[in-house]
């Protein structure tokens, strides 16, 4: 039996272990509280495993089905071709709680990057078939419009889309030269000057997209965007901009893909972030909180025959998603519904944002651009070094937060977070900023920054 004190030593024999310098106690961690198995110390977790844990640690309802989950671990079926009642119960629950009525098609796979990857393949297939039907021999349709500071994964196609602050994610890997557009992100508070500036950027972005469509037209299969960019810096967009993208996609017969791997399943105070903007995507990639990943498609896919949801083996994988993840997701979705956790995210998110705005007023030299929808909140530090020092200081005071973009700190509480826990987090942050000791912290390969996904 490996002891908690030896975990990193054992792992580091073969793996990089530059993540958090704590060992997760899978039994004693509870709700929003991460327990270090080495010391028994509790950390208030406001990163939630990169926004992948919806209902916290050891939710009582999940503990009730622990034996069932263990039973499922004995055999791992190939869900793509071998079916079970457990999978059927999952799909039935997913349809009822998570699937927008306008999106009847769904595909499951393991990993958010592969969710995006298969959304792209769906778009390529759709566009090429459309071009072939209009002009035999015209098999163009192999490019994707995307945005600066986007994070869509680290797999084959997605490497050509991802371009966040950390170049190590994509450097030296072969990539396609697909059109990359400026991201007209909002700066808060959204006063007159900031609104004028973002409209200028929106016009520049839309102009660039129009130019790409004029030059490459038939070869553009899709446009992809995160409704709120996460890893790239918690970058928000105006509804009017996303609506303009929808109109462009309709006008030029390309598919609009929303990557909701991070924004989905209640984090923003709506089940899906796109619901805030009165914009309906053609394809939607999901993951993280759903445990099993995948993508959904609207009826626009049905404009062609033999699309990827009709023709066998066009998109597939051995496992078609992990059955244990599916069953866990079944119960998580029911918990979210019955405990009204999307509404909790909206209410507590409003409190969290208000507290961040107070921080900006009290510490204007440290906190700017406080922003958020629901619990997906962030603020900017003066520079990346100060950001890293603050994150390390918060960690030392038992608060787990991670960075994003070049100098932002992101908040990703569990959907079950309480007002009291938000107040505790703010007390820690205020104490660190008041004392100012963070300026003496050395930042090298810091194990607590967690700028990973």
Regions found by a protein language model. Give the residues of each.
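Conserved N-terminal phosphate-binding loop of PLP-dependent enzymes in the Aspartate aminotransferase
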Residues: 1-453
């Amino acid at each position: 039996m490996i002891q908690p004190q030896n975990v990193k030593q054992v792992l580091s024999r073969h793996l990089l272990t530059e993540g958090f310098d704590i060992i997760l106690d899978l039994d004693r961690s509870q709700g929003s509280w991460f327990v270090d198995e080495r010391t028994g110390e509790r950390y208030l977790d406001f990163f939630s495993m990169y926004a992948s844990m919806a209902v916290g640690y050891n939710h009582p309802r999940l503990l009730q089905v622990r034996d069932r989950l263990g039973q499922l671990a004995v055999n791992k079926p190939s869900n793509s071709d071998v079916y079970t009642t457990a999978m059927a119960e999952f799909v039935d629950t997913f349809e009822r709680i998570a699937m927008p009525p306008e999106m009847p098609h769904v595909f499951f796979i393991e990993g958010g990057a592969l969710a995006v990857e298969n959304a792209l393949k769906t778009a390529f297939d759709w566009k090429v078939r459309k071009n072939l039907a209009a002009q035999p021999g015209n098999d163009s349709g192999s490019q994707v419009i995307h945005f600066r500071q986007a994070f869509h994964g680290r797999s084959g196609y997605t490497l050509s889309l991802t371009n966040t602050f950390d170049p190590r994610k994509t450097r030296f890997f072969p990539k396609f030269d697909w059109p990359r557009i400026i991201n007209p992100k909002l700066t808060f508070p959204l006063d007159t000057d900031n609104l004028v500036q973002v409209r200028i950027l929106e016009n520049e972005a839309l102009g660039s997209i129009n130019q790409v469509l004029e030059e490459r037209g038939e070869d553009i299969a899709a446009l992809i965007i995160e409704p709120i960019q996460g890893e790239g810096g918690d970058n928000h967009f105006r509804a009017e901009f996303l609506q303009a993208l929808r109109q462009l996609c309709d006008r030029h017969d390309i598919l609009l893909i929303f990557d909701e791997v991070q924004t989905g399943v209640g984090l923003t105070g709506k089940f899906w972030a796109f619901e805030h903007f009165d914009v309906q995507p053609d394809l939607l990639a999901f993951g993280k909180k759903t445990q099993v990943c995948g993508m959904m498609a609207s009826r626009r896919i049905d404009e062609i025959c033999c699309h990827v949801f009709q023709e066998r083996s066009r998109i597939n994988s051995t496992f078609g998603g992990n059955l244990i993840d599916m069953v866990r997701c079944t119960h998580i979705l029911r918990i979210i519904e019955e405990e009204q956790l999307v509404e909790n995210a909206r209410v507590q998110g409003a409190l969290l944002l208000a507290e961040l705005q107070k921080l900006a007023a009290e510490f204007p030299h440290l906190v700017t651009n406080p922003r958020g929808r629901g619990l997906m909140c962030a603020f900017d530090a003066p520079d990346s070094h100060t950001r890293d020092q603050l994150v390390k200081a918060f960690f030392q005071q038992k608060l787990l937060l991670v960075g994003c973009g070049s100098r932002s700190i992101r908040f990703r509480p569990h959907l079950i977070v309480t007002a009291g826990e938000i107040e505790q987090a703010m007390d820690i942050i205020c104490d660190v900023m008041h004392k100012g000791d963070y300026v003496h912290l050395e930042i090298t390969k810091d194990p607590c920054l967690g700028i990973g996904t």
